[in-house]
């Protein structure tokens, strides 16, 4: 086995690990929703979508036996992580600067109209407001933890893309 094959195998293993972590984070969100009754807001649901996209792209990337396929799916996973960073940062901002919502979030109809909200309403249906701040976990709010998780997902993906940019075959 040459060095390139060993590196590809390691890369694929790391993608599986990343996917499992993202699925565990969504599982944690569902635990908070159903057992601690912390209703998800539109930005929470969008963050779930981004975690699931990262997991899907990482699992698919781990199935490829060539650098070209792995790199393509790493790019898609990194873009999903960037989308998650933007969404989580917006959520942190909204909670730090609450406005007047009248009990309605403008994103709710959009998020609830997406097909997964109809297929799996228990996972993707909006039930809360983005301004609602739940008790912090280890000193950070849920949007802050989500932001940390997206950054932690993005950094290794970006480093991998830079480190392996010459591997095409």
UniProtKB/Swiss-Prot annotation:
Say which family it is in.
Answer: Belongs to the DsbB family.
Q: Which residue ranges does the entry give as Periplasmic-facing topology?
A: 32-49, 90-144
What Pfam families does UniProt report for this protein, alphabetically?
Answer: DsbB (PF02600)
According to its UniProt record, where is this protein located?
Cell inner membrane
Q: Which GO terms describe its molecular function?
A: electron transfer activity; protein-disulfide reductase activity
Chain segments annotated as transmembrane: 15-31, 50-65, 72-89, 145-163
Function recorded in the entry: Required for disulfide bond formation in some periplasmic proteins. Acts by oxidizing the DsbA protein.
* InterPro entries hit by this protein: DiS_bond_form_DsbB/BdbC (IPR003752), Disulphide_bond_form_DsbB (IPR022920), DsbB (IPR050183), DsbB-like_sf (IPR023380)
Gene3D superfamilies named among the record's database cross-references: DsbB-like
The way this protein sits in the membrane is described as:
Multi-pass membrane protein
The UniProt keywords, alphabetically, are: Cell inner membrane, Cell membrane, Chaperone, Disulfide bond, Electron transport, Membrane, Oxidoreductase, Redox-active center, Transmembrane, Transmembrane helix, Transport
Stated name of the protein = Disulfide bond formation protein B
Q: Does the keyword Transmembrane apply?
A: yes
Q: Which organism is it from?
A: Paraburkholderia xenovorans (strain LB400)
List the Cytoplasmic topological domains: 1-14, 66-71, 164-169
Gene Ontology terms describing biological process: protein folding
Q: Which gene encodes it?
A: dsbB
A GO cellular component annotated for this chain's UniProt record is: plasma membrane
Q: What is its main location?
A: membrane
User: Which Cys pairs are S-S linked?
Assistant: 41-44, 102-130
């Amino acid at each position: 086995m040459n060095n390139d094959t060993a590196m590809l195998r390691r890369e694929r293993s790391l993608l599986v690990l990343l996917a499992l972590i993202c699925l565990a984070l969504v599982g944690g969100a569902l635990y908070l929703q159903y057992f601690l009754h912390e209703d998800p807001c539109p930005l929470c649901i969008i963050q779930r979508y981004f975690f699931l996209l990262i997991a899907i792209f990482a699992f698919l990337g781990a199935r490829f036996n060539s650098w070209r396929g792995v790199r393509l799916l790493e790019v898609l996973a990194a873009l999903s992580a960037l989308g998650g960073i933007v969404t989580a940062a917006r959520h942190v901002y909204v909670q730090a600067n609450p406005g007047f919502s009248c009990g309605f979030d403008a994103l709710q109809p959009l998020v609830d109209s997406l097909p997964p909200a109809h297929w799996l309403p228990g996972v993707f249906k909006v039930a809360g407001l983005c301004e609602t701040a739940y008790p912090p976990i280890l000193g950070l709010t849920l949007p802050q933890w989500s932001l940390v998780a997206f950054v932690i997902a993005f950094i290794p993906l970006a480093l991998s893309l830079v480190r392996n940019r010459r591997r095409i075959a």
